[in-house]
From Swiss-Prot:
Top-level taxonomy: Bacteria, Pseudomonadati, Pseudomonadota, Betaproteobacteria, Burkholderiales
Subunit structure: Homopentamer.
Cofactor info, note text: Binds 1 NADP(+) per subunit.
Biological function: Catalyzes the interconversion between ADP-D-glycero-beta-D-manno-heptose and ADP-L-glycero-beta-D-manno-heptose via an epimerization at carbon 6 of the heptose.
Alphabetical keyword list: Carbohydrate metabolism, Isomerase, NADP
Protein name per Swiss-Prot or TrEMBL: ADP-L-glycero-D-manno-heptose-6-epimerase
Positions contributing to NADP(+) binding: 11-12, 32-33, 39, 54, 75-79, 92, 143, 169, 177
Cofactor(s) needed for function: NADP(+)
Positions of substrate binding: N168, R179, H186, F200, G201, E202, Y203, R213, Y292
Gene name of this polypeptide: hldD
Catalytic activity: ADP-D-glycero-beta-D-manno-heptose = ADP-L-glycero-beta-D-manno-heptose
Stated family: Belongs to the NAD(P)-dependent epimerase/dehydratase family. HldD subfamily.
Top-level class of the enzyme under EC nomenclature: isomerase
Length: 331
């Protein structure tokens, strides 16, 4: 039975396609926009049955042109939190998602989609409840508005609808994202090219490099998606993070020590790296003041209650694995 992945050449979408392949699934229709042609590299080692441009997909799916479809993993979106074109953001993230969901409901197709922890914005509590949702940018609002519609639709839906509020995801196949790629990716490239890593200095009560995020490996993101794919009776909106906030210092230290280890050099503590000038703390940029999440940490209660019991990788585990993968890629 056919599976459809939108955003299939993007970061999370490509990893989901690869994860499905590893389970023997190859009847996969990949949907994306390859205006950025280099994104093809994300799925060059994947097996798919067809590729469609996103502009052609929704109407054809709504007409039932693809026969019996089991599920759609809807990962396609504009994920640039600095995007200021609100009309583009709402059309791409909200209107398009509505059309995909409605077609799924009409045909009884499982609908698993990407929401975001950006829906919480300035909140200090990260639980899937309306009182904690205060997005700081139009990206977060576009995701929240769709979540709000989903909450109403789920009351009467006869097929699965699952939204995943992704926290700070890192891992393979994100190189096309540019400035929106993970901190781990940028730290890796900066240390290799410059021999140092730059982190934000003190801001909003947090020490240098001490701003904390829930960094989650894309390996775990794929596992959670596939868990719900295997359990079509479970619907809801779920946080997808480790439940453990870690400072940016941990990312930088893990990246640098992995690269040092590859050169036969000993591991150093964060303090030692800073003392040797290998970590450089820079003034927090004025452009981000008031628009920046200094702390995120997923409340996993709802995810665990749904039956997902597997442990999540720590930054030290996941980032080291990611760096080892990056080291094997062609320069």
């Amino acid at each position: 039975m056919t599976i459809i992945v939108t955003g299939a050449a993007g970061f999370i979408g490509a990893n989901i396609v690869k994860g499905l392949n590893e389970r023997g699934e190859t009847d996969i229709i990949a949907v994306d926009n390859l205006t950025r042609a280099d994104k093809f590299k994300n799925i060059v080692d994947c097996q798919i049955s067809d590729y469609l441009d996103k502009t052609d997909f929704v109407e054809r799916f709504a007409r039932g042109e693809f026969g019996k479809v089991r599920a759609i993993f809807h990962e396609g979106a504009c994920s640039d939190t600095m995007e200021t074109d609100g009309r583009y953001m709402m059309d791409n993230n909200y209107r398009y998602s509505l059309a995909v969901m409605r077609a799924c409901l009409d045909q009884g197709v499982q609908f698993l989609y990407a929401s975001s922890a950006a829906t919480y914005g300035a909140s200090e509590t990260f639980r899937e409840e309306p009182e904690f949702e205060r997005p700081l940018n139009v990206y977060g609002y576009s995701k929240l508005l769709f979540d709000q519609v989903v909450r109403r639709v789920m009351l009467t839906a006869l097929s699965q609808i699952v939204g995943f509020r992704y926290f700070n995801v890192y891992g393979p196949r994100e190189q096309h994202k540019g400035r929106m790629a993970s901190v781990a990716f940028h730290n890796f490239n900066q240390f290799r090219s410059e021999g140092t890593v730059k982190l934000f200095g003190e801001y909003n009560g947090y020490p240098q490099g001490g701003q904390m995020r829930d960094f989650v490996s894309v390996e775990d993101v794929v596992k959670v998606n596939l868990f719900f794919f295997d359990n079509p009776d479970k619907s809801g909106i779920f946080n997808l993070g480790t439940g453990r906030a870690q400072p940016f210092n941990d990312i930088a230290t893990t990246v640098m020590n992995t690269l040092r280890g590859a050169e036969g050099k000993p591991a150093l503590s964060t303090e030692e790296l800073a003392q040797e000038g290998l970590i450089e703390y820079v003034k927090f940029p004025d452009a981000l003041r008031g628009k920046y999440q200094c702390f995120t940490q997923a409340d996993q209660s709802r995810l665990r209650a749904a039956g997902y019991t597997a442990p999540f990788l720590t930054v030290q585990e996941g980032v080291e694995r990611y760096c080892q993968w990056l080291l094997k890629q062609p320069v």
